[in-house]
């Protein structure tokens, strides 16, 4: 019978795992990656909301025009699209739901009669809800 000797590997006492510094570096790197990815994702959400606001304003303008076709006049306020205004014959609404009178950021869409160079203006004040601004804070107007 042949005997084989089993040899054991040398002790790994010097390799106890990762040091505290290595763990901190890994956590910092993971945090940096998550910050970068998060900012990209949130930026995409704002871009989507801006595009939705443009589309919503165009749709709301069509509803205002339907109101005008039915009643012979423009609504005095956007709420007239939701509930029939007093003394308004020919109203076949509601033309809009209350939620449609707010932009994707939850701000009330501004409606002005007469408009600046047109019959009416519809304006979303953007992400910050204030006039002016740049990027996603800029105003979105009906053209």
UniProtKB/Swiss-Prot annotation:
Cleaved by the prepilin peptidase. It is found in: Cell inner membrane. It is a single-pass membrane protein. InterPro entries: Bac_GSPG_pilin, N_methyl_site, Pilin-like, T2SS_protein-GspG_C, Type2_sec_GspG. It comes from the Bacteria. PROSITE patterns: PROKAR_NTER_METHYL. One of its GO terms (cellular component) is type II protein secretion system complex. Residues 1-17 form a propeptide. Disruption phenotype: Deletion mutants can no longer assemble into the pillar-like structure. One of its GO terms (biological process) is protein secretion by the type II secretion system. The chain crosses the membrane at residues 18-38. Belongs to the GSP G family. Type II secretion system is composed of four main components: the outer membrane complex, the inner membrane complex, the cytoplasmic secretion ATPase and the periplasm-spanning pseudopilus. Forms homomultimers. Interacts with pseudopilin tip complex component XpsJ as well as XpsI and XcpH. Interacts with XpsN and secretin XpsD. Core component of the type II secretion system required for the energy-dependent secretion of extracellular factors such as proteases and toxins from the periplasm. Pseudopilin (pilin-like) protein that polymerizes to form the pseudopilus. Further polymerization triggers pseudopilus growth. This is Type II secretion system core protein G. The gene is xpsG.
